[in-house]
Amino acid sequence: MKDLDVIGIGALNVDQFYRVERILEDGESVTRGSATYPGGSAANTVHGLSRLGAKTGFIGVVGGDAHGRLLTRAFKTAGVGISQVRAKPRARTGSVLCISDELGHRALYVTPGANSLLSADDIDPDYLKRAKILHLATFVDDRQFELSVALVQKLPRGVRLTFSPGSLYAARGMKSVAPILRHTFVLFINRQELERLTGQTLESGVRTFMKEGCRTVVVTLGAGMKIGRTDAVCYIRSGDREYIIEALPAETGRRTDTTGAGDAFAAGYLFGVLTGKSEDVCGRVGHLAALSAISKMGARQGLPTLAHLSNRYQRTYGQSL
């Protein structure tokens, strides 16, 4: 029985944010503020989907510490199922040191912690069968990468895989990631990751992913790039059709923090998939979700509710969502 829309699997981290005037290569600077928020790429996407009304769950590992309790409490508050989130009593919860400046640039330093303890014993095959979609994101260590590869080879029938490789898996190269791409229904990747993974330009790289087996490739373009006459924020290829999503201004007039923007985009896009929208509408919904997310510090603080997202979609595109 498919009683869950999306199950996420990936690292569970606490993001420790520091705002600075500018990121230095060497020197000393005063912080403008700091805060601690729940994070992790797949976790952010699943959290965002839950806020939009999707039925979600998560597979992952936290430590038996205050940060682990923070992460599970955040999931519970959002309505994400946590029956498959394992707490390892003697481990410390994973963390990411996030340094962002006033221009929206950022530097991330990852301590995997308890995430490195996730094993096949922590994954219940019967739980996976309950999902329409499994959304996979990254881990730091080789063991969890290999576990991810093995998992997608045995994915239950009827469960579609969506995949966000991020910079960590992009650095592993195409040969390593190909076994996952072969089973991918929707690939979420940004332009820099595409270029690093394939060594190719946008459209050539997308064609490579399609040849590897991806059904749909969604490339986010950060602050945007010109494609023809369009200021594009996203390029989508599905089968033999392509879609270009036009960039819109941020809600606050500037980017407060871009951490988690891609995760928010994936949440909006997948909401569109779950509700039967076309690829271009999915892309627009993803773009609006990302704009909302970057209006506040932290990957999840600005994630929209369905009411907020629907209202802005109506105002922007003159259509109901």
Regions found by a protein language model. Give the residues of each.
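Short, glycine-/polar-rich solvent-exposed loops and beta-turns at beta-strand/coil boundaries
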Residues: 89-91
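Glycine-rich phosphate/adenosyl-contacting loop at the front of the ribokinase-like
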Residues: 1-61, 66-73, 77, 254-255
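Conserved post-catalytic alpha-helical subdomain immediately downstream of the catalytic base
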Residues: 51, 221, 248-319
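Ribokinase/PfkB-type carbohydrate-kinase core domain
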Residues: 1-12, 73-87, 100-248, 304-308, ...
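Short pre-catalytic strand/loop immediately N-terminal to key active-site residues, enriched for Gly-Thr
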Residues: 29-39, 206, 244-260, 280
